[in-house]
Design a protein with these regions (language model features):
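Mature catalytic domains of secreted/periplasmic carbohydrate-active enzymes
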Residues: 1-160
C-alpha cells in the first residue's frame, strides 16, 4: 500500500513481524511489553489532529476509512500478541465525540488489564511532560482512577 512498511525490505523477505519479535524479546528477558501507537496524524491520508484535511466527499471518505483503519490496527495489536502491559497513544486517542477513531472500547475489550494512555475518558498514568526524556526527581506519575488529566479533579488532595 505504501513504502512505510516492512513488505518493501529484504529482512525476512518482507514477511517479518517486528511487533511479534519485540514482544517475544521482552518476554524472553522478563520485560512487560508495551506498544506505542501514533494515530493522531497520518500524512498519507492527510490526517491532522484526527481530522482529514479538505472538504467534500473525498475528505469524508478518507475520514471514515482512517477511523476504521486505526480501530482495526489497534484491534490487531490487542489480539495478536498476548497480554500487553500498556498501550501508549502518542498525542492521545480521540474521544468518541471527536473526529478520530474510538480505540478505547477496542483496548478495553481485548486488553482489559493493560494500562491505557490516553484520552479524555481514561488515562491510567501521567506523562512526565518532557520531550527531552527527562523529568524532575522524584517523579510520581500516578493518580487515582477514574481520572483524566484533561478534566478537573474535585480536590487536589485526591492526587499525588
Amino acid at each position: 500500500m505504501n513504502p512505510y512498511c516492512l513488505k518493501a525490505v529484504k529482512w525476512r523477505d518482507g514477511k517479518g513481524d517486528i511487533v511479534r519479535d519485540f514482544v517475544n524479546s521482552c518476554r524472553k528477558y522478563g520485560i512487560m511489553p508495551g506498544i506505542y501507537v501514533g494515530i493522531r496524524w497520518n500524512s498519507l491520508l492527510g490526517i491532522h489532529n484526527f481530522k482529514a484535511q479538505g472538504e467534500g466527499v473525498f475528505a469524508r471518505n478518507r475520514q471514515q476509512w482512517y477511523k476504521q483503519m486505526c480501530e482495526k490496527m489497534v484491534e490487531e495489536l490487542c489480539t495478536r500478541y498476548g497480554d500487553l502491559f500498556l498501550i501508549w497513544f502518542d498525542g492521545g486517542a480521540d474521544d468518541p465525540e471527536g473526529d478520530g477513531p474510538d480505540v478505547l472500547p477496542v483496548v478495553t475489550k481485548y486488553q482489559p488489564d493493560c494500562l491505557f494512555y490516553h484520552n479524555v475518558q481514561r488515562a491510567d498514568f501521567r506523562w512526565g511532560g518532557s520531550e527531552t526524556g527527562t523529568v524532575a526527581y522524584p517523579c510520581w506519575s500516578s493518580f487515582p482512577q477514574p481520572y483524566s488529566h484533561h478534566k478537573q479533579s474535585d480536590s487536589d488532595e485526591e492526587h499525588l
